[in-house]
């Protein structure tokens, strides 16, 4: 079996050693080169043609952002960002530029933390063999075009074009309308979520809940970033937060988000992951809870990601009479979670990322005309 060939790019000697040690503990991985800055990194990528690059963002001579732009344009390669929590805002910019995923940077002498980081890195490296690089490049170029277009509009507009929507006065909602849109994602999820949420109208008549596999400490910055870009109210969920129309709750990293109905209100409950939860925040835990609490008024959406998280949830939503969507293979960065959801046989529609927001809006009763 051919090994996964990796180049490690980091100006810190300690980080290079720690990352290399983590990688070389995987029998299917071979570290084939190192670089201490972006310029050297580009030369190594061109010469060695690795399957994967681990990348520090802050380096001398050429930073990780510049390297990402050049690599994605001329030599598309899978990139996992290695970042400290103090750089979490920069991580999401790197994901926009085409990085596949990120892991927290190891710190000296914290053995328990290093073990957790190693497990996270191993899982994401193994996902490289399922990677849709063409989809990443297509997504990155579409986002660049969208950003340029956004610059031509007024400063108050969202960075993605919205579908034409009807107002409540011209389109009365049916009695059995959806109450919640629940979206789950993993690898490749942050840019996909940004694209979808920024295309929804500010007066969105449903609540939106999101579980994105992400370490503790990063989800708050992710939510704050999306809140600045989207017309919706977006925040990291706290225990007891109300689930209400026009609001997006993002499950906090390292925890699961479930729901509890209290009279006419529904509240989020933030709970510790179960022993069977391989991925956290768990998409299945969120979707199963939605099926129980919201029943047929649930729209479940499974986006890009490794593994099968979400497949139990879509089955439960279907049994409860709700609706489900899955991202199409051609746009999914990793077609693992959507594939497993589709394999249940209960997904109502398979939708490419570029049409997902329109499909959600249509199913929520707002879209005036769909082709």
Curated annotation (Swiss-Prot):
Pfam families: CheB_methylest, Response_reg. PROSITE patterns: CHEB, RESPONSE_REGULATORY. GO terms for cellular component: cytoplasm. Signal peptide: none annotated. Residues 5-120 form the Response regulatory domain. Residues 174-362 form the CheB-type methylesterase domain. This is Protein-glutamate methylesterase/protein-glutamine glutaminase 3. It comes from Geobacter sulfurreducens (strain ATCC 51573 / DSM 12127 / PCA). The gene is cheB3.
